[in-house]
Amino acid sequence: MSQYITNPRQQSRQLRRNSPSGQEPHFATSSVPLNQRNSILDPHLSVLQLLDRADPPSELSSLKHGEIAKPATPRRSGFESVNCSISESWQSIKHTDCSMVNTQGDATHQHAGILSSSDTSEDEPDAQLSPSPNNFAFPNSATSIFPEAPHNLEASSLREYQNSEIANPREENDNETVTMSLMNSSNSFVMPKLSLIQQSQKFCILIVGKPAQRFYRDIPRAYHKMFEVRDVGHLSPREMNKYSAVMVIFGEPKEGKELLEKVAAHNSNIIAVCQRGQQQQISNILNRYSKSNEIRLVYHLTVMSDHQDVHRLLRYLNTLSTEVDSGYETEVGSRKIRKRRKSSKKRSPQITVNRWVIWSISLTVGVGLGYCISCLLSSTSSTLSVTLRSGDEVTIMEDIHNSPHESPFDNYLRHLLLAVKRAVKQVNSSFKQYLSGQSLPVLWMQRIGKEWLSEASDPTLPGVTALDLVLV
């Protein structure tokens, strides 16, 4: 196994001694036995032999390398010379060689550009916008910023350039524009320079008034982020104008009027909250200011002790803040003012007329049914025997009772029915008098009925006819 792990230098010396001419033998020749060529470095030696057999350098590269003076290197033999040539080869590459290769490859490279709607030709080359890696150049960083090397610049001009950058580090001009050209064949457009100095206004409501702290403590903590409690005397007009709205908590009507005047001068979006019993006075003050367009009510007047109304107010403000933060509404109070829903609704005149008609019809039907029932009951209690002796004479016979012997219960029932019948007749007569005095059509119908009934000889017809008139 020792012959397979021999040192490469010893192996090369042994081969040099065995060679008759004293020249360096090739490592991959067939004259060397197989057991002598098998070693760990055989694959690497084959690669080195291929590098030695490379083509001779071209004229262009020989001229380029001839201009650069190389230090004299001692001649080495075997593996040392090969390793040194490989290690020194990458150091001999200069930036000029890379740029020369790129300039030579530009002629044969097919350019690919970005097409736009204003392009007239698709084959126009554009080397700056081409995404190909072969088009990538290696410019010097100093020459890309300055027109000449930094050490060639004068000290005064460099100092002026640095001072100008230090003097205006964050100066921005909104009127400044940037002109960009997409391609050589495309039209240029003007892009305005955006400014991020002004930040978007955050939805926040200022609470003022003596009971402001108590109101702020009573509301849930989830709504605290929307409010801020401060004193009006310590606020400048600019700070008060930053708030989306101002919630005025009225303690006393006299002090509330002065407080409302201070707030309305700088912020017109008002949310009014008063104490119980002050609704009429505070509403008069608010109406006076709203008619003169000095304030704008975001929500209707709310009582501080009414927890349900306060909860509805907080929910409304929460939804309003969500819409403002999301950008759906740009101004607080753009909605219409929410008005309190009244529990008592005004009755329309149509409903009133319909109710009177229904009541009159129901009373008429009830009286008519009662009269019919009383007539039927009276006819069953007694029967009349009528005999006609001649066409001009009518005789009424004696009443023939159904049963000769009456029980006390039947007698009591008959008296009760008679009493009900009399009561119904009295009610009917009084109702007729009321209707005759109230409505002219009923009076006219009664007059017609009397004239028509006066000609009739049967005494039972007037009652039936009067019932028909009432039903009509």
Curated annotation (Swiss-Prot):
Signal peptide: none annotated. Mitophagy-specific receptor that recruits the autophagic machinery to mitochondria and regulates selective degradation of mitochondria. Mitophagy contributes to regulate mitochondrial quantity and quality by eliminating the mitochondria to a basal level to fulfill cellular energy requirements and preventing excess ROS production. Recruits ATG11 to the surface of mitochondria. Also promotes autophagy-dependent peroxisome degradation. It is a single-pass membrane protein. It is found in: Mitochondrion outer membrane; Vacuole membrane; Preautophagosomal structure membrane. Keywords: Autophagy, Membrane, Mitochondrion, Mitochondrion outer membrane, Transmembrane, Transmembrane helix, Vacuole. It comes from the Eukaryota. GO terms for cellular component: mitochondrial outer membrane; phagophore assembly site membrane; vacuolar membrane. The chain crosses the membrane at residues 356-372. This is Autophagy-related protein 32.
